[in-house]
Curated annotation (Swiss-Prot):
Gene3D superfamilies reported for this sequence: (Glycosyl)asparaginase (3.60.20.30)
Post-translational modification: Cleaved into an alpha and beta chain by autocatalysis; this activates the enzyme. The N-terminal residue of the beta subunit is responsible for the nucleophile hydrolase activity.
SUPFAM superfamilies in UniProt: N-terminal nucleophile aminohydrolases (Ntn hydrolases)
Protein name, as recorded: Isoaspartyl peptidase/L-asparaginase
Gene Ontology biological-process entries: asparagine catabolic process via L-aspartate; proteolysis
Organism: Homo sapiens
Keyword Electron transport: no
Enzyme class: hydrolase
Length: 308
């Protein structure tokens, strides 16, 4: 089985020209990290975790150190990870003061009998596991302070659009043993209510992985994704004989028509077919397979290069 990793950097509005190159570099870095793990014989779970950690560590993306701020000006992060081999999974929500929520989600998967920990319980577990705590203000960037100020101003003027300031990072992978996995991480929505939890940590919505079908990681308007169970819906269509591209189009189309939700997703099937699809304006993504790196941000704009 030829290994593959696909990553995304969130589906939302247009990305400014001054950010595109930095976003490009971040996506390539994450895909290269994930693929490097697979090429050395690592598992799909290792690969998706490694790729997402790279994105959480990049302030260009809405996860980890680039997370957007809630209405109190604080960072609250959500993340989940799933192993398609045995459907084991781990998730955390509303976590603060840690650099990499996806690592904590994996600890939930491997070190507890549970699938999901939140808020204070997740924080207590992180401390028990020796996860380093960092000051919350270290996760707050000037860019996200300005985004929060702008959102509050526009909300006061009743000009806000709940689907414009979105962002998530995610990865799916297929390893040489035929195992699939997904990982998804986010800071949520700008100016969200304290305690708001979106789709990213929710199995079946923010992602899903099953060796019998494939793996999906989603992005977009979290409430809409939750309502249609976007990740599992996409895998359902694959179960019914649809190609990965057809399945992605069907599920995203249903979310748009049924609840007017915009978003995107990445998919890898158990046979190694993959796709990146979105209905939002843009979605940075990258895929690494067979020594080639595929990358795009806007529709009909894909580049293919050799991997180092």
């Amino acid at each position: 089985m030829n290994p593959i990793v696909v990553v995304h950097g969130g589906g939302a509005g247009p990305i400014s020209k001054d950010r595109k190159e930095r976003v490009h570099q971040g996506m390539v870095r994450a895909a290269t990290v994930g693929y490097g793990i697979l090429r050395e014989g690592g598992s799909a779970v290792d690969a998706v975790e490694g790729a997402v950690v790279a994105l959480e560590d990049d302030p260009e993306f809405n996860a980890g150190c680039g997370s957007v701020l809630n209405t109190n000006g604080e960072v609250e992060m959500d993340a989940s990870i799933m192993d398609g081999k045995d459907l084991s999974a781990g998730a955390v929500s509303a976590v603060q003061c840690i650099a990499n929520p996806i690592k904590l989600a994996r600890l939930v998967m491997e070190k507890t009998p549970h699938c999901f920990l939140t808020d204070q319980g997740a924080a207590q577990f992180a401390a028990a596991m020796g996860v380093p705590e960092i000051p919350g203000e270290k996760l707050v960037t000037e860019r996200n302070k300005k985004r929060l100020e702008k959102e509050k101003h526009e909300k006061g003027a009743q000009k806000t659009d709940c689907q414009k300031n979105l962002g998530t990072v995610g990865a799916v992978a297929l390893d040489c043993k035929g195992n699939v996995a997904y990982a998804t991480s986010t800071g949520g929505i700008v100016n969200k209510m304290v305690g708001r939890v979106g789709d990213s940590p929710c199995l079946g919505a923010g992602g899903y992985a099953d060796n019998d079908i494939g793996a999906v990681s989603t992005t977009g308007h979290g409430e809409s994704i939750l309502k249609v169970n976007l990740a599992r819906l996409t895998l359902f269509h694959i179960e019914q004989g649809k190609t990965v591209e057809e399945a992605a189009d069907l599920s995203l189309g249903y979310m748009k028509s049924r609840v007017k939700g915009l978003g995107g997703l990445i998919v890898v099937s158990k046979t190694g077919d993959w796709v990146a699809k979105w209905t939002s304006t843009s979605m940075p993504w990258a895929a690494a397979k067979d020594g080639k790196l595929h990358f795009g941000i806007d529709p009909d704009d894909t580049t293919i290069t050799d991997l180092p």
